[in-house]
Amino acid sequence: MKMNILVTLNSGYIQPLTVMLNSLLSSNSNRDFRVFVAHSSLTREDFRYLEEHVPMDRCELVNIQVPHTMFADAPVLERLPKETYYRLFAARLLPREVNRVLYLDPDLVVVHSIDQLYRLDFKGNLFAAASHQFG
């Protein structure tokens, strides 16, 4: 069974995403992944770059094109681009058959297995999250 991963990004995060995906595969050598790539501006060249720099035998990329109009009125800051909002609407963006997905920032490095995190008991909640503290 493939683990479902969600990433949200713009073209400025393609290279960091290749690092994240390679570290994910390296730290989870016994797993295959379906990676949902939610974006509104990636090009074919961006996806081609990913396919050339990430082993595709264990990593299926799924292109989730988000309409530009979906977040046209959302507040955008330098540290809060519109792509940040996509994860909040994962249930609307992902295929209905996806019943569990793990969101990972495209600029992190995975250093351990994510099995335990992926199988976390939500205790009846629709989602679980970790806090992010600055400073």
Regions found by a protein language model. Give the residues of each.
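Glycosyltransferase catalytic domains, chiefly GT-A lineage
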Residues: 1-135
